[in-house]
Amino acid sequence: MLTRQATEADIPAIMEIERTEGFEAYVGRSERAQHEALMAAADCHYVMLEDEVGLAGFAILQGVGAASGLLYLKRIAIRSPGKGLGKRFLGELIRLSFEEFGAEKFWLDAFETNQRARYVYASCGLQHDGVLREHYPLADGTRANLVVMSILKREWLTAEAQRQSQLAAQADARDPKLPEFMDAALADIASDISEKDR
């Protein structure tokens, strides 16, 4: 998985992903001029996701460098959901927000009906903050509820420290120390070799 900052050359691919069949109920859509304006904004950062096949997804972050320390994930979309890339991508976006952009809070909103995305967000440590009722106008004239979720920098740092500790413990388990009797046996072998060399 590789991430990079987007350029205007990526806009057609971004719009294609936004308009993937079945995404209309879960992913917002913007016209080219809107994407160009967002890319030009000082507080906005587009992130592209690539895998071994090519472009796999994108995200739009807003509030970069804001004095409030609030960084908003305006949009995230994966070309082929269900392969685990979304969770890994979100984890990288959260890390980027706190470590590189200096945010104090990372937040987003999601369609209340998008259970899969909300599950992924929760699995990355985001907590439920509330519901914006009938907040987003849909193409069919109805309005959708949005669920607000967030994670604080201190919460992420605590979770990251625990994750690193678990990884270290797993590494130790895969590479255990040699038992004392094996150490002794190896020492005897080394001694025999040394004797023969004399």
Residue ranges of model-derived segments:
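Terminal substrate-recognition subdomain of acyl/acetyltransferases
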Residues: 140-167, 182, 186-189
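Conserved catalytic-core motifs of GNAT/GCN5-like acyltransferases
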Residues: 107-110, 127-144
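Acetyl-CoA-dependent GNAT
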Residues: 5-9, 15-82, 90, 95-101, ...
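Conserved active-site alpha-helix within GNAT-family acetyltransferase domains
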Residues: 87, 112-130
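Conserved GNAT acetyl-CoA-binding A-motif
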Residues: 99-109
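Extreme N-terminal starter segment of soluble prokaryotic enzymes
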Residues: 1-2
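Short linear interaction segments
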Residues: 168-198
